């Protein structure tokens, strides 16, 4: 167990950040699945709407540092390619 005040504070900070990062990561997974489901049904309008929500969430997560910027770009690129394939 931590012996100093600063170590106790670091434990609290880590717990808070871990909880926040888990929530954001979980939300991104859910939104990514919604985009995939919309692409699966070949509904371009629903896919575009889901992509806009997903893209915004990914950008926010990257800005805060929850995910790296390159990973955010990869997520958005893959989703955009999948939507573009819908005829």
UniProtKB/Swiss-Prot annotation:
GO terms assigned for molecular function = small ribosomal subunit rRNA binding; structural constituent of ribosome
Low complexity compositional bias, start-end: 13-23
Tell me the InterPro entries matching this sequence. Ribosomal_bS20, Ribosomal_bS20_sf
Establish whether keyword RNA-binding is in the entry: yes
Q: Which domain of life is it from?
A: Bacteria
Q: Which Pfam families match?
A: Ribosomal_S20p
Q: Could you tell me which residues belong to the region Disordered? A: 1-26
Show the GO cellular component annotation of the record: small ribosomal subunit
Q: Give an example GO biological process.
A: translation
Which keywords annotate this record? Ribonucleoprotein, Ribosomal protein, RNA-binding, rRNA-binding
Q: Which NCBIfam families match?
A: S20 (TIGR00029)
Q: What function is annotated for this protein?
A: Binds directly to 16S ribosomal RNA.
> What's the family?
Belongs to the bacterial ribosomal protein bS20 family.
| Protein name as catalogued | Small ribosomal subunit protein bS20
Gene (UniProt)? rpsT
